[in-house]
């Protein structure tokens, strides 16, 4: 009997040891997987570093590109647009003007009523419509037919007080967020598509002519009399209320910048000189690239698989269309190596490109709850990653911060490059000139962490003394309103050239 008891005890002890060994082994494997996840995070963080010294290198490279772009037509980053003198006279106009805001997955139509010199903007309203994905990769005719139809709906619903008298056409400022040869006239061609568009038959075509044709087919009595770039529109909209606006930056689905330059500093400009002696420069800075940009394997893969590989590199690192996608790619790498750690049955939910949008990333980044509830909900609802631990959510939050911080600090470097080109990057005796930067776009407006990082980074780069003279203002709907304002001043543009 004793032998049986002893034998049973031995067997029981062995079983306990075996279970304990399995538990220890499981914990070791789990610990090992967590270690790999953290290693991926640390590696990504290291490659995304944007020390002040690196940002100053990026700013210097931006300035060099700006000089090159202004020197000859071969420069790709800067192109001369509308004379600055038109903006100072915007307040003189009376009447109702329209603007079409096109360049992302949505487009807007605006109606602006101006009250003249003392009246300012009396009334403004807009309607927004989504562009079906099929039209973003279809034909030019199909896209502009859809836009004209939405324009017609907007006009049909307007109040009687906005109706034009017989014989007078409604006048439209066409605000285009796509890189184009916009000449502040009633013509212009698309240089290349960005922001998810890929319509081959529209490249090189007169987009104003295409829109005009579509409006005629809809029997819409409206004339396009100004083709305006997004940042030029934002600068005009900001200048309407603040005379010190000298720079405009768009941070939305895409990104771009414009600034005020002296005509003498534009060697390639051979046209008439406006009375102000200044011009607005559209930079197309989304297409900026430099060896100093902290690119990672995730950025290279995103670029290679995009509709426009090797183009818009700066935009792909800093704009609302791509930030969430960069995060998704890093999470996919984590999941591939640490599948059990993420409690996932399949990687399929992470395989869909752009399934994780930047607004989702922003919501997670702004989560301050003790258990990071929003992060957990987003992972479950969008990526089908359920039952995540707190440390998993913290890892995701850290990745959000890395992606956003890199983008915001690179934007700050871009602004520093502009200020450097304008000679406003160093303190002046007697006090520095006040410079107002008009900002527009959903990324800047809604992603608070991104906005604060950008502004604080620029302050650090400039130094405390100079930073007090640089002011950021949110020019809400500035680009679209600016397009309407520039349309209103079109006749003055001709007078300035006389």
From Swiss-Prot:
Region of interest (Hexokinase large subdomain), ranges: 229-477
Keyword 4Fe-4S listed: no
Pathway field: Carbohydrate metabolism; hexose metabolism; Carbohydrate degradation; glycolysis; D-glyceraldehyde 3-phosphate and glycerone phosphate from D-glucose: step 1/4
Residue ranges occupied by any Hexokinase domain in the UniProt entry: 35-488
Amino-acid positions noted as binding ADP in the UniProt annotation, renumbered to this chain: 104-106, 253, 442
InterPro entries listed in its UniProt record: ATPase_NBD, Hexokinase, Hexokinase_C, Hexokinase_N
EC assignment: 2.7.1.1
Annotated D-glucose binding sites: 194-195, 229-230, 256, 284, 315
Keywords: ATP-binding, Chloroplast, Glycolysis, Kinase, Membrane, Nucleotide-binding, Plastid, Plastid outer membrane, Transferase, Transmembrane, Transmembrane helix
Localisation: Plastid, Chloroplast outer membrane
Disulfides per UniProt: none
Ubl conjugation keyword on record: no
Tissue specificity of this protein: Expressed in young and mature leaves, stems, roots, stolons, and developing and mature tubers.
CC annotations in GO: chloroplast outer membrane; cytosol; mitochondrion
Lineage: superkingdom: Eukaryota
Pfam family, one: Hexokinase_1
Gene Ontology annotations of biological process type: glucose 6-phosphate metabolic process; glucose metabolic process; glycolytic process; intracellular glucose homeostasis
Membrane topology annotation: Single-pass membrane protein
Region (Hexokinase small subdomain): 89-228
TM segment ranges: 4-24
Main localisation: plastid
Task performed by this protein: Fructose and glucose phosphorylating enzyme. May be involved in the phosphorylation of glucose during the export from plastids to cytosol. Seems neither to be involved in cell sugar sensing nor in carbohydrate metabolism in tuber.
Family statement: Belongs to the hexokinase family.
The protein, known as: Hexokinase-1
Organism expressing this protein natively: Solanum tuberosum (Potato)
Gene of this entry: HXK1
